[in-house]
């Protein structure tokens, strides 16, 4: 080895500066990504509620009434066994499967509803009904029949 040859590479100080810069950038980006995840979850819940409303409307077109609270949203997948029975139930159902909300909870159907013909809601991120973060069909701009 010749004495004039220098080994090339990064110094410890240069590597530490790069790590600090990456840390600062990550601290700026991660909170924005987390906020977007929350918005995306809420938007998915809204989309699910709209899809369930459409399925409920199709059910009503065939059977002249919405499923009751006791029959629940399961009536959109399988014919209800509790009265009032659905005389003209579509043998394929009105939706292939019931979605869970983005937080893993079931959507709830209340019929008759307090805010319209029926109320459809998700408990929201906290998983508790009746709190401010609930996502509801009466909170959407679409008007119910």
Swiss-Prot record:
Type II secretion system is composed of four main components: the outer membrane complex, the inner membrane complex, the cytoplasmic secretion ATPase and the periplasm-spanning pseudopilus. Forms homomultimers. Cleaved by the prepilin peptidase. This is Type II secretion system core protein G. Pfam families: N_methyl, T2SSG. GO terms for biological process: protein secretion by the type II secretion system. The gene is gspG. Core component of the type II secretion system required for the energy-dependent secretion of extracellular factors such as proteases and toxins from the periplasm. Pseudopilin (pilin-like) protein that polymerizes to form the pseudopilus. Further polymerization triggers pseudopilus growth. Induction: Silenced by the DNA-binding protein H-NS under standard growth conditions. The chain crosses the membrane at residues 10-30. It is found in: Cell inner membrane. Residues 1-9 form a propeptide. Its main location: membrane. The modification N-methylphenylalanine is found at residue 10. It comes from Escherichia coli (strain K12). InterPro entries: Bac_GSPG_pilin, N_methyl_site, Pilin-like, T2SS_protein-GspG_C, T4P/T2SS_Core, Type2_sec_GspG.
């Amino acid at each position: 080895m010749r004495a004039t040859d220098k080994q090339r590479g990064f110094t410890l100080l240069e590597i530490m500066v790069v790590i600090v810069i990456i840390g600062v950038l990550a601290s700026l980006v991660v909170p924005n990504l987390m906020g977007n995840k929350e918005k995306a979850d809420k938007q998915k819940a809204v989309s699910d509620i709209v899809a369930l409303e459409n399925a409920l409307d199709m059910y009503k077109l065939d059977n002249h009434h919405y499923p009751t609270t006791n029959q629940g949203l399961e009536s959109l997948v399988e014919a209800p066994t509790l009265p009032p029975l659905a005389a003209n139930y579509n043998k394929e159902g009105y939706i292939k499967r019931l979605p869970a909300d983005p937080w893993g909870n079931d959507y709830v159907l209340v019929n008759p509803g307090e805010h319209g013909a029926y109320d459809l809601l998700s408990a929201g991120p906290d998983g508790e009904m009746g709190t401010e973060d609930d996502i509801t069909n009466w909170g959407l701009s679409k008007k119910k029949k």
